Structures are given as structure tokens and as C-alpha cells.
């Protein structure tokens, strides 16, 4: 009886490990097939940080002056705008999606156990959507608007 139980447990563990391996392999293949998306996300990390911080003095730690925070925000915004300008016109929606993905990833990493603020997520999503116009980058008139989902399931 113990042997049967042991083999059943071993079979379950093997199936679970196989499923996890398949999932990891699928993600790896996806990134292999789309290396430009990973590169784009890396390029847009200043945008993700800018959006995540929302560059408000409310988020300023007590040991940083508001002037330092403003200067830091200006630098991040300039870096973000430079990176957005490097992205081809037809992929601006992808760029915005990448910024949103970065923001969501940062939130999951840093605030996994803290209360999630829906209004802050919406404000970040709106800021991410407006980054191209903040940078003075406007799509051509025949370009369709972007539709970006947020964590709360709201589309912009």
C-alpha cells in the first residue's frame, strides 16, 4: 500500500514539474520569438519608473527635498521621451502597453502584500497613455487609438 501511495505521489510530482517546465518553456519561446518586445520594455524602463512614481511630492521620502524629487522626475521624463522617440511610429501602442506592463510588474514586485489602490492604478494608466503627448509625439491622423487594459479590467 505504501509503495502504491509513493508511486502515486511521484506521478503527481512528475506531472506538476512537467507542467511547470512546459509553462517556462512556452514563456521562453515567446520571448525568443519576440526579442524586440523585451528590448522595447528594457528601453522603456525610464517611462515605467516615471509613471510608477507619478512624480508627485506626496511620494517623496522625508529625506529628499521636493527640489531633488522634481529634478529626478525631469530627468526620468527626458529619458522616457528620448526612448519613445526611438520607437517606430506604428508601434506606439505597443510602447504604451510595455510601459503599463512595466508598471504592473513593479507594483507586483514591490507592493504584493500591501493594499492595492485602484485610483492610483487608474492614474498611472492615464499617465502612461499620455506619455507620447507629454513628449510631443503624436500619431498620424490615420492611426487608430490605443486600447490598454489595466489591472482593474478598465480599458482606456
Curated annotation (Swiss-Prot):
It comes from the Eukaryota. Residues 1-19 form the signal peptide. It is found in: Vacuole, Aleurone grain. SMART domains: AAI. SUPFAM superfamilies: Bifunctional inhibitor/lipid-transfer protein/seed storage 2S albumin. InterPro entries: Bifun_inhib/LTP/seed_sf, Bifunc_inhib/LTP/seed_store, Glia_glutenin. The keyword Hydrolase does not apply. Keywords: Pyrrolidone carboxylic acid, Seed storage protein, Signal, Storage protein, Vacuole. The modification Pyrrolidone carboxylic acid is found at residue 20. The keyword Cytoplasm does not apply. GO terms for cellular component: aleurone grain; vacuole. Lacks significant tandem repetitive sequences. Seed storage protein; serves as a source of nitrogen, carbon and sulfur for the young developing seedling. Belongs to the prolamin family. This is Prolamin PPROL 17D. It comes from Oryza sativa subsp. japonica (Rice).
Amino acid at each position: 500500500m505504501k509503495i502504491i501511495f509513493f508511486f502515486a505521489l511521484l506521478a503527481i510530482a512528475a506531472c506538476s514539474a512537467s507542467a511547470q517546465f512546459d509553462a517556462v518553456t512556452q514563456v521562453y519561446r515567446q520571448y525568443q520569438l519576440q526579442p524586440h518586445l523585451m528590448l522595447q520594455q528594457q528601453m522603456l524602463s525610464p517611462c515605467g519608473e516615471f509613471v510608477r512614481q507619478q512624480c508627485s511630492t506626496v511620494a517623496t521620502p522625508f529625506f529628499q527635498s521636493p527640489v531633488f524629487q522634481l529634478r529626478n522626475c525631469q530627468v526620468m521624463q527626458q529619458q522616457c521621451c528620448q526612448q519613445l522617440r526611438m520607437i517606430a511610429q506604428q508601434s506606439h501602442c505597443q510602447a504604451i502597453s510595455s510601459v503599463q506592463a512595466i508598471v504592473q510588474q513593479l507594483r507586483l514586485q514591490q507592493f504584493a502584500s500591501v493594499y492595492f489602490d485602484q485610483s492610483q492604478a487608474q492614474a498611472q494608466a492615464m499617465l502612461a497613455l499620455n506619455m507620447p503627448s507629454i513628449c510631443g509625439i503624436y500619431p498620424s491622423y490615420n492611426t487608430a487609438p490605443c486600447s490598454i487594459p489595466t489591472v482593474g479590467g478598465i480599458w482606456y
